[in-house]
From Swiss-Prot:
Keywords: Disulfide bond, Knottin, Secreted, Signal, Toxin. Residues 56-95 form the Agouti domain. It comes from Lycosa singoriensis (Wolf spider). Expressed by the venom gland. Residues 1-16 form the signal peptide. Coiled coil: none annotated. Belongs to the neurotoxin 05 (agouti) family. Contains 6 disulfide bonds. One of its GO terms (cellular component) is extracellular region. Residues 17-54 form a propeptide. It is found in: Secreted. Disulfide bonds join C56-C70, C63-C76, C69-C87, C78-C85. This is U13-lycotoxin-Ls1a.
């Protein structure tokens, strides 16, 4: 039974890949007609807007210093001194440091973890 299931799965996978290649090659050869959108007039007035540059960098994006990173606790981590810098997660101390030195992307509040607080 397991062998039959594996055989059917392999045949189905081969069928899917071969039919996908036929559609891709037909599309590249312009053999398929373009689909006409009946609501195209409705969206004709909307023009695509240019993406504006952000004033801060998300996690994993390039940065020059901690003030370039968006999140309050994000820090600019560099490999080999000042090369290959990117924004990574920091901690509460990072937020306090950013609050003191950053003029742009300055944190409004610094989150504290609830792990060390005593209850009761």
């Amino acid at each position: 039974m397991k062998i039959l299931f594996v055989l059917i799965s392999i045949l189905y996978a081969v069928y899917c890949f071969s039919s996908e290649e036929d559609v891709d090659s037909a599309y590249l050869a312009n053999e398929l007609e373009p689909v006409e959108d009946i609501n195209s007039e409705q969206y004709a007035a909307l023009e695509p807007k240019e993406e504006q540059g952000r004033s801060c960098a998300d996690m994993g994006q390039d940065c020059k210093d901690d003030c370039d990173c968006c999140l309050n606790i994000a820090t600019c981590n560099c490999w080999f001194g000042r090369y290959f810098c990117s924004c990574t997660f920091g901690d509460y101390q990072t937020c306090l440091r950013k609050k003191g030195k950053c003029k742009r992307n300055r944190p409004q509040s610094c989150p504290r973890s609830n792990l060390n607080r005593k209850k009761g």
